[in-house]
Amino acid sequence: MTNKYIDIASCRIFSSCWKRSKIVFTFILLLVVSACSTTKHLPEGEVLYTGNKTNFVDQSNTPVGQTAVGEIKAALDKSPSTKILGFIPFPFGMWVYNDFVKYEKGFGKWIFNRFAAKPVFISTVNPDIRVKVATNLLHDYGYFNGKVAQQTIVNPKDSLKARIEYTVDMRNPYFIDTVYYSRFTPKTLRIMERGRWRSLLSHGEQFNVSDLDEERNRISTLLRNLGYFYFRPDYMTYQADTTLVPGGHVSLKLLPVPGLPPAAQRQYYVGKTSVYLIGKNGEQPNDSMNYKGMDIHYYKKLQVRPNMLYRWMNYQAFVKNDSLRNLQRSRLYSQYRQQRIQEKLAQLSIFRYMDLQYTPQDTTATCDTLNVRLQATFDKPLDAELEVNVTTKSNDQTGPGASFSVTRKNVFGGGESWNVKLNGSYEWQTGGGKNS
């Protein structure tokens, strides 16, 4: 009797699956039969894009060349709408688009939204623009003589369909011969020359715009760590000359941009430091004190020790590194110092918000001093955390567990934390044993 019921249920399941398969098969068959053309709904004057092919001539095998090839392929590639998921060569999405574009609601609209692929036209692919982008990429990677061309090939069986064929002639790459620094102030030039040993550009390396940008960032960081607060990487530009040294070599000259602001060419020193401590509920400071020349503004009662605030804001004076201590004594602005102060304050976890600003001491044209202002909002003093888990031990004991922890921040006014954690669990024996 039991086997009979099982057989009947199996037949019903098979029948249901067969009916669903027939519906799907019929739906696909109707699409195939009705979709006699993928171009019947094209707007006037448009040509359906069916794909592209990229041919490389003299393809470079250098590491830089391989990177260039990858980016050029990505710039030229565009998937047509005549493929499912971009790789199956059947215009399923176009068939759905042609047959269900007329539906505005109901099942037909659902099918359209789910499966239809909007046609891609040759005009929207913009092959000429893609050629320009690919050509610029060749130049960026040192292929100054490289050429990119495109040809639109119309389908001989249907004039409303066409594909695009690109030809990329990379030719020979150019390599760096020399790099000069010029037209900066004498002091700036001396700093740049002293740091040249860390340069990312060297003789014999292939020209690469990415390396040029990284070199500008390196020099900007070098200068900003030695007082040039207003200096930026985009204040420098390159001139490239391929005629000085023949045979595929380029001479580079790094120059300041025209109209470089005078402030960017001046070293700045750190002046007065002010700290504004805001309460955890947004209470504004209503009292202040001065500690070793540092003004501290706070609400009602100072919640951190002033000597610790001074140490955090002048950490370089307390390190063992002689060069860092000398830089601290010189009071030159340093981007590295600014970042380290922000990191150290963030690691304390006692402030919810921090803002460290450097502003000129006055508005005169000869001002070379920056005042420091730290504004920090205290976080809530207590942190609570509850964890729930299930543990299994090697002795077949299994059960739920929980842990509850409380952390008190800034216990002694120096960024210290005090933590209490409670653990609890209930276990029973598994694997055929009795509960315990």
Spans of features found by a protein language model:
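A generic structural signal for short, non-catalytic loop/turn and secondary-structure boundary residues
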Residues: 26, 172-174, 266-268, 377-379, ...
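N-terminal secretory signal peptides that target proteins for export/translocation
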Residues: 1-19
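Sec-dependent N-terminal signal peptides
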Residues: 16, 20-28
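Gram-negative/organellar outer-membrane beta-barrel architecture
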Residues: 188-191, 331-436
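Short intrinsically disordered, low-complexity coil segments enriched in acidic
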Residues: 1-3, 298, 436
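C-terminal motif of bacterial Sec signal peptides marking the signal peptidase cleavage site
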Residues: 32-35
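Interaction-mediating elements
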Residues: 37-347, 353-356, 369
